[in-house]
Structures are given as C-alpha cells and as structure tokens.
A protein has these predicted regions:
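Metal-dependent phosphoester/phosphodiester hydrolase catalytic core
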Residues: 42-44, 53-77, 81, 90
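Metal-dependent phosphoester-hydrolase catalytic domains
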Residues: 17, 74, 78, 87-97, ...
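Conserved hydrophobic/aromatic beta-strand scaffold that supports enzyme active sites
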Residues: 9-11, 47-51, 65, 148-149, ...
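N-terminal, active-site-proximal structural segment of metallo-dependent hydrolase catalytic domains
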Residues: 3-7, 81, 184
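Active-site flanking residues adjacent to catalytic metal/cofactor-binding acidic residues
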Residues: 66, 99-102
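Structured beta-strand-rich core segments of catalytic domains in phosphoester-bond hydrolases
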Residues: 1-60, 159-163
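Short histidine/acidic/glycine/proline-rich micro-motifs that form metal-
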Residues: 2-3, 69-71, 104
Length: 184
C-alpha cells in the first residue's frame, strides 16, 4: 500500500562489493510518484531501483526490480511501457538490468517496447537454461516462464540460471529464483 503493508520489491546487493549511490520506488500506475493501483490491476504494483557502484572497477550501473499485475492485461502492458520510460529517465545511458515477475510469457507482445531497448539475459547468455520459473508450489507445469532478466548498455551477460534447488524445502516460493552473472 506504500505505507505499512503490501508488496515490496527488495533489492539485495553485496555491501562489501558495491556502494549504493541512489535508490527509489515508483508505482506502476497513471500516478507513479504516489502509492496507487494502475489501470485494471488487481493489486498495487511497484518498481524499485538502485544505482550501484562497483568498488573494484569504479563503474556504475542500475538495477530495476518489478512485479507486474497477475490479473490486469492492461496493467501489464501499460506497466511495461512505464518501466521502459522510467528506466530511460532514471538511468539515462548508464548500463541497466531489469528483473522481475512479469506474469507474462516471453513471447507476449507486451514485451515489444522493452525488447527495443533491452536484451533478454536468458536469450543472450552463452551459458543458459530453458527451465520454467513458475512452480505454483508444485501445482503448475514446470515449463511456465514468467520471470525475466533484461539488460542494456555496456554489460556482458555471462550466465543465466533458473535456481530450481530445494534449499531444504521443496518450494521456497511459487516462483524459482533466477540469476544473471555479468561483467561491466
């Protein structure tokens, strides 16, 4: 809800490796600067971002994390357009990574605005997989891919992975984590 309850798009980073230069959250709605629900969305949805500097190389990049609505088709389509516009406005020409639960398969036309400016880590990494990302706590077919990582700028994507291990429990979420190894 933007105050004390609801969804959060946390970004975790290695504090001994990266300096946090700036960060923020916006809402996937017609009023992104304040807590709100967009279009035909069932829930308030957000995008969180962080500007990070690598302490080793001194290079900076942005990481954006989002979660598109699970019910509203218009909310997903408009959410992608807003995400693309906000990445351009916030990151400028600085390298950027976008990750999240898009609640949409890769071949959906809603990705067109995104794929004009960013590349799919799953498709571009020399080491990759074709594992499904949504498991529904064991109730979904294991071929559904609705979680994605995209990148742009002077980043080299080295590896993409869907982390399907059980970590001591069969399912830690209804989605499997995904990961991208990259160099700046």
């Amino acid at each position: 809800d933007g105050d004390k309850a609801g969804e959060t798009m946390a970004i975790y980073y290695l504090r001994d490796r990266f300096d946090l230069l700036d960060s923020g959250t916006l809402w996937l709605s017609e009023t992104p600067d304040r807590p709100s629900r967009g279009w035909d969305g069932a829930c308030n949805r957000t995008m969180t971002w962080a500007e990070l500097r690598d302490r080793t190389s001194g290079k900076t990049f942005f990481y954006f994390n989002t979660h598109l609505d699970h019910k509203g088709k218009t909310a997903r389509a408009e959410g992608v357009k807003l995400v693309v516009a906000q990445i351009a406005a916030i990151a400028g020409k600085t390298p950027a990574i976008l990750g999240g639960d898009f609640n949409t398969p890769t071949d959906s036309p809603i990705f067109r605005p995104l794929t004009k400016t960013m590349k799919s880590a799953r498709d571009k990494a020399p080491e990759t997989d074709r594992e499904g990302t949504f498991n529904g706590f064991g109730s979904a077919p294991d071929t559904i891919v609705i979680d994605h990582l995209y990148f742009r700028g002077k980043l080299k994507c080295l590896r993409f992975a869907t982390l399907t291990g059980d970590y001591g429990a069969p399912y830690i979420s209804d989605h499997y984590p995904i990961s991208m190894t990259f160099s700046l």
